[in-house]
Amino acid sequence: MADSQNGKSAFFFFFVSLILLFLSPSYSDVTASESDPIPYENSDASPGVVTSSESDRQGVSLHRLEELVRNLTELVARLDAKLSETPFKVKKEITRDEIEEKAKAFSVTKYSPFWSERFEFTSAVKLDSEATCINVLPFRDHEGLSKYFAVGDSSGRVFVFLRNGDVLVEFFTTCDSPITAMVSYMSVYKNESFVVTGHQSGVILLHRLREGSIGEDLNSAVMENVGKFDGTEDGLQVTLLEVHHVGRVRYILATDLSGKLTVFTENRTVYGSVSPTSRPLVFLKQRLLFLTETGAGSLDLRSMKIRESECEGLNHSLARSYVFDASERAKAYGFTSEGEIIHVLLLGDIMNFKCRVRSKKKVQMEEPVALQAIKGYLLIVNQEKVFVYNVSTQHYVRTTGPRLLFPAALEDIRSTFLSHRESTKTTDHQKLEKVTPLIASDREKLLVMGLGDGYVATYKSKLPISKAEFNTMLWSSPVFFFILFLFGAWHFFSKKKESLTAWGPDDPFSSTTMSSSSTTTAQNSSAFSESTRRNDDHMDLRRRYVSPSRYPPGAATGAYRSVGSNDPSSRAPVETTNYRTTAQEMKYRGGSGLDSGGFGKRRESLFGNNKALDDES
């Protein structure tokens, strides 16, 4: 607006000067003389007398000046109109740009609501240096959630934070080299843990972290350096640290940039070292199996020998990073040099194992990346975004691999707890400096993620964990058919046993079968062992005892004789004492009256005429 006003004033000043110049007599004379050069014939004429020719010349000059003034007036009017319209348009454009800028600044916090809806923000911390490594410590609270997490930076320091973001410990590890790997495990004491840090210079250090016990401040902790591991002065960067438990003995496995695998004991001495053909990327806990850039391998601690094999379906591409599933140990997810997300199965033991790629998916993602798994989900972080994948249902895993739920920009995640100005400064700083992707978890719901420029944030997952329903059971599974086979075999043999024992010798209602089986047993008794004969005698002894009847003697006798009336020779008269006995007789029959001397003699038939029945038959 100031430039337009200055232009208008300069133009009017030029216009007024031009009019005054034309109206001046000297300029008019010069103009007239140049336009109509008429010689003075009468040189003697007096200068005060004005001739007709001079008046004509003045009239022509005035007419030209009027035309010039008219043209200039029209030009000024046009310029005024244009100048009056231009500020409105400029102001309108500026207002529109400001509105768009305000809308854009407002939409930064609402650009991707997926992250804030699915992950609950817990805390955020700011380091004055670059974070290079994150590890969730094994301390648990009464709810089973992790209490602390440790962050290593580029100057060799370790920061221990509470889950709510409070700084618990700031500790210098005695090595100013950046921390590139970190692992922790519990001590034999409940309130102590050990933290192992691997540095870019190849140094591996052991530290002890002790939290406040009962009677002390529970939110206080002390960290001290225990010592340095032997044989770590080769200068190669430590890329991987893992702890292996054998009973109460712990071994620390370390891998450097060249792929060399070194095993240390708890007292920081070297147990052994071996160099595989491909660099290990991740270890399967408690099985000494690991995935490499080209396949898989296993380590035998006794002989310190390595077995390696290629991964079926990898097709000679190199894996950059791996992470094992949080629920199923045999599953792993990786990112290859071809920009593919792969789903891998690692089965077997250290002597016989097999690696197979189940699925591949091409993605638009730039390296480097960091992978982390929580229950049912996979998270991949690069320098700009975080990608969340669903791996909870078996259908996705068996057919197309992990399914992408949503991506979220790190800038949008930062804007949820930073102001717009601070977030913009962080973004500009990240454009100049490359961000190291960092992410860690407790394999449950707690997530710790580096957001660049020293910011580290913690989140709690609100994602639903889908459990396999009954109708999703794989009916073609071999385990299911094996269970069916076992059930069928059990049913068949149980029915067969019932059919064989249904009419056995214990049945008192088949006298003919009982008599024939007794005769057969007597004839073939010499062919059986002593134990078999004793078992038969015990069975005969049980059958020899007749239980008292609940019916009166008369009714029992009449009922029995009515049956035997059809065949008088089939049964002998039954005495009533066989059905009703006194207490003394019961005592006599259950006492010494029985022949217990070896059970050598064959017992007599219960009824007297059984032999006659056998003869008649």
From Swiss-Prot:
The keyword Cell membrane appears for this protein: no
Coiled-coil residue spans: 60-86
Biased amino acid composition, Gly residues: 590-599
Polar residues bias (residue ranges): 43-53, 563-584
Protein's membrane topology: Multi-pass membrane protein
GO cellular component: endoplasmic reticulum; membrane; mitochondrion
Bias-annotated ranges (Low complexity): 511-529
Membrane spanning residue stretches: 10-30, 473-493
Keywords, sorted A to Z: Coiled coil, Membrane, Transmembrane, Transmembrane helix
Biased composition, class Basic and acidic residues, residue ranges: 531-543
Region Disordered: start-end pairs: 34-58, 511-617
Annotated localization: Membrane
Name under which the protein is recorded: Uncharacterized membrane protein At1g75140
Organism from which the protein derives: Arabidopsis thaliana (Mouse-ear cress)
